[in-house]
């Protein structure tokens, strides 16, 4: 009755039961979630442990790889240092050998000096002995002279002193002559050693220049376009460049002929651009030639700057640099003048280092020694004098200016630097293969050399050898004496200098031989 009369009781019971059921369900859900969370946490921890192990392995591998790379790098550095040490060891050994050789030479010279000193001492002792003998002789002759000729003691002493002084002066003159000859031989040997060292240490590249250039054509039809209507195009090219265009049967090629390398290069580059562009007519030709000329001026300026950089010559006037660049397209007996100037600069530097003088100054003088050849066709005078004036005009030191003017004996050399430039110039120009001549002119020059020698009286035969750098003359011993042979060689050399033009120098050797033949019967 109570429950019926109070329906809220059922509702409360239902709520209590529902709450209990919800509580238990919630509790189970929470427990299940906790289990899931614990399982996930465990899984995360396990995954983290696995990832950590993997990272540890990767880090270990990476560290091993880095250690290996560092080890390889260190081994390479150690090997490089070991090689450097070996090179230094070889250099030191070479220096020790050089020092040892110099010591041996010094000891030999010292021994020669010791021998000479001993000989001098022996000679002095002999002189002392002679003095004593002379004194004794004076004492003996004093009374005899006074008795026979009435000569006083002072007069006798004067006669004897004059005799002894004359003998001593003769001995001293002989000794001085011997020492002078020994010093000349030693100086000659040292000079030859320095020149040989310079030649051995410098090995420059050399490419012979030609007087013709060939321009390839895409087809033979292009020859007609280059010639143009009634030849107006080819005439325009020749007029603008000053180069002869030769179009012959040579397939797909045009030949450019000219002795001015700058103009020939302008013509070659201009023709290549015209062929590539396809527009070939007089107006376009003049435009392209002018453009190429400006570009070539920039190229020559860059060549001059590169030359000064290679030599280490700083502060050279910009006009001199431009003139140096022009030497790139200037040749002398087939030898490129810029390459020759660089070669002379390096040879001067090597020899200057051996002699203990300023290497940079020597290189600078060698580089600029032929600067006059860049404008010798525009200015009157020899290229040495022109170069001297240009160097003075653009602020080069007085030593450089004088060395340039003296390298071809236009003015007498007065310093070691002047002689170095002359020697390096001769080495660069006279070495085999440096300069070339056409076969006809080469043979003609040899014939002219022999003809000049054969014109002199007393010359039996003459032979031009060593590519015309040495003239051997066989003199008639019945007509030429030994003294006249020396005079003959000088006269022939003077005649060659007056009548011929040639690179380098020519040695004239007169050989006089006397033969006596008899038969035993």
Curated annotation (Swiss-Prot):
Signal peptide location: none
A GO-annotated cellular component: plasma membrane
Pfam family, one: KH_1
Membrane topology: Single-pass membrane protein
Alphabetically ordered keywords of this record: Cell membrane, Endonuclease, Hydrolase, Membrane, Nuclease, RNA-binding, Transmembrane, Transmembrane helix
E.C. designation(s): 3.1.-.-
Primary location recorded for the protein, binned into one broad class: membrane
Location of this chain's protein in the cell: Cell membrane
Molecular functions per Gene Ontology: RNA binding; RNA endonuclease activity
InterPro entries per record: HD/PDEase_dom (IPR003607), HD_domain (IPR006674), HDIG_dom (IPR006675), KH_dom (IPR004087), KH_dom_type_1 (IPR004088), KH_dom_type_1_sf (IPR036612), Ribonuclease_Y (IPR017705), RNase_Y_N (IPR022711)
Gene Ontology biological-process annotations: mRNA catabolic process
TM regions (residue ranges): 1-21
HD domain boundaries: 337-430
KH domain mapped to chain residues: 211-271
Entry function: Endoribonuclease that initiates mRNA decay.
Family stated for the protein in its record: Belongs to the RNase Y family.
Name this polypeptide is given: Ribonuclease Y
């Amino acid at each position: 009755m109570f429950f019926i009369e109070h329906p809220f009781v059922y509702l409360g019971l239902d709520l209590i039961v529902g709450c209990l059921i919800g509580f238990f369900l919630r509790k189970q859900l929470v427990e299940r979630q906790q289990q899931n969370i614990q399982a996930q946490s465990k899984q995360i921890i396990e995954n983290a442990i696995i990832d950590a192990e993997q990272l540890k392995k990767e880090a270990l591998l990476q560290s091993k790889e880095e250690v290996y790379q560092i080890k390889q790098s260190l081994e390479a550095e150690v090997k490089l240092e070991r090689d450097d040490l070996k090179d230094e060891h070889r250099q030191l050994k070479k220096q020790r050998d050089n020092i040892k050789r110099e010591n041996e030479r010094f000891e030999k010279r010292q021994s020669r000096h010791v021998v000479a000193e001993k000989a001098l001492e022996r000679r002095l002792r002999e002189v002392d002995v002679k003095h004593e003998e002379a004194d004794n002789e004076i004492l003996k002759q004093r009374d005899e002279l006074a008795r026979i000729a009435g000569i006083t003691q002072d007069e006798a002493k004067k006669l004897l002193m004059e005799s002894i002084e004359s003998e001593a002066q003769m001995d001293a003159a002989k000794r001085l002559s011997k020492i002078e000859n020994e010093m000349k031989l030693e100086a000659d040997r040292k000079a030859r050693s320095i020149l040989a060292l310079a030649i051995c240490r410098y090995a420059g590249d050399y490419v012979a220049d030609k007087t013709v250039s060939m321009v390839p054509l895409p087809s033979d039809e292009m020859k007609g376009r280059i010639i143009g209507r009634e030849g107006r195009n080819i005439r325009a090219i020749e007029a603008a460049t000053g180069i002869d265009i030769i179009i012959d049967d040579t397939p797909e090629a045009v030949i450019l002929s000219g002795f001015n390398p700058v103009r020939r290069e302008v013509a070659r580059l201009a023709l290549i651009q015209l062929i590539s562009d396809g527009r070939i007519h007089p107006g376009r030709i003049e435009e392209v030639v002018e453009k190429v000329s400006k570009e070539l001026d920039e190229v020559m300026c860059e060549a001059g700057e590169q030359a000064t950089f290679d030599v280490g010559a700083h502060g050279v006037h910009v006009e001199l640099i431009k003139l140096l660049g022009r030497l790139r397209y200037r040749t002398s007996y087939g030898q490129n003048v810029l390459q020759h100037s660089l070669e002379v600069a390096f040879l001067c530097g090597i020899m200057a280092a051996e002699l203990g003088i300023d290497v940079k100054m020597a290189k600078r003088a060698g580089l600029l020694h032929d600067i006059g050849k860049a404008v010798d066709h525009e200015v009157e005078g020899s290229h040495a004098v022109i170069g001297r004036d240009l160097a003075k005009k653009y602020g080069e030191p007085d030593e450089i200016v004088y060395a340039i003017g003296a390298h071809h004996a236009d003015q007498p050399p007065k310093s070691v630097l002047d002689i170095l430039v002359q020697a390096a110039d001769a080495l660069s120009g006279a070495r085999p293969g440096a300069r070339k001549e056409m076969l006809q002119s080469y043979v003609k020059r040899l014939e002219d050399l022999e003809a000049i020698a054969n014109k002199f009286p007393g010359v039996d035969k003459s032979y031009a050898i060593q590519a015309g750098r040495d003239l051997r003359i066989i003199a008639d011993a019945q007509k030429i004496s030994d003294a006249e042979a020396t005079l003959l060689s000088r006269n022939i050399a003077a005649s060659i200098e007056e009548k011929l033009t040639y690179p380098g120098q020519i040695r004239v050797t007169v050989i006089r031989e006397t033969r006596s033949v008899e038969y035993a019967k």
